[in-house]
Amino acid sequence: MEQEDFNIREHQLTSRERDFENALRPLSFEDFSGQDKVVENLRIFVKAARLRGEALDHVLLHGPPGLGKTTLSNIIANELGVGFKVTSGPVLDKPGDLAGVLTSLEPNDVLFIDEIHRLSPVVEEYLYSAMEDYRIDIMIDKGPSARSIQIDLNPFTLVGATTRSGLLTAPLRARFGINLHLEYYDDDILSNIIRRSASILDVPCSVRAASEIASRSRGTPRIANALLRRVRDFAQVKGSGSIDTEIAQFALEALNIDKYGLDEIDNKILCTIIDKFKGGPVGLTTIATALGEDAGTIEEVYEPFLIKEGFMKRTPRGREVTELAYKHLGRSLYSSQKTLFND
């Protein structure tokens, strides 16, 4: 069977798949699997805020994509018993956009801003007073007739999510009273998440099949659930409708996702560094140009997992692949070094 290069991270969900995605999201801390330390701390912070009848301190959630930042934000609102509004940094283009969202919040509501590192500087400055003093100052008119009007806001909790916390300005970061980092999930927890999702989707899934999918899910629940949906398709068309180990392996191989969870782009990154740059070191921008990919996407989406799993490392001079990458790709590290010294 011809392999399909399926980039699970860039796959665009249909509206129906988005409904499935929402149906799979836990709605309470009790149902949320993984991130034990983060969840335990949030339980305490949320309970304390409820006992005081106050808005929860502003929360910053950071970590790689797909680890549950949006889900946790929704759970925070559910546990507080307040409203939940969602927006993102790129959408808030002007101060007026931010003002419209902030003035619509009821007391103690949760406002979730995804990709908060992508806020424009002018919008970010308006956010400072909103976070600290629950007010914003809006300029009316222009020129000599311009004047500032102060608008009081209801107390609220801002939950900011970012995959690139290093891009946050120091003043914005300092205004978050709660700062939490999300880690990759281990395979056992991912396997439990997959079995829970399979139950919600009403598709039988064996323990071993769930473990097989989990092992190729890059420690990421979003990827695990996306792979589950695709394996379910294969089970319905090529199998009996149930997901067992055999159909799971068949589907994942057809999707060109290897036993480490690496997909076509991951392997292209490693091959490019080896074949074109003799294993590195090489700069990120150079890698991106050679691949025709965005440097930010490589740094944010692909690189963290490759480094975590030991296929790549960062050095002061650039990115280098490791001996494990050579073994994984069936390449000879000695041959590469020999070529380097012969140049």
From Swiss-Prot:
GO terms for molecular function: ATP binding; ATP hydrolysis activity; four-way junction DNA binding; four-way junction helicase activity. Residues 1-185 are annotated as: Large ATPase domain (RuvB-L). It comes from the Bacteria. Mg(2+) binds at residue 70. It is found in: Cytoplasm. Keywords: ATP-binding, Cytoplasm, DNA damage, DNA recombination, DNA repair, DNA-binding, Hydrolase, Nucleotide-binding. It is an enzyme of class 3 (hydrolase). Residues 259-343 are annotated as: Head domain (RuvB-H). Homohexamer. Forms an RuvA(8)-RuvB(12)-Holliday junction (HJ) complex. HJ DNA is sandwiched between 2 RuvA tetramers; dsDNA enters through RuvA and exits via RuvB. An RuvB hexamer assembles on each DNA strand where it exits the tetramer. Each RuvB hexamer is contacted by two RuvA subunits (via domain III) on 2 adjacent RuvB subunits; this complex drives branch migration. In the full resolvosome a probable DNA-RuvA(4)-RuvB(12)-RuvC(2) complex forms which resolves the HJ. This is Holliday junction branch migration complex subunit RuvB. It comes from Bacteroides thetaiotaomicron (strain ATCC 29148 / DSM 2079 / JCM 5827 / CCUG 10774 / NCTC 10582 / VPI-5482 / E50).
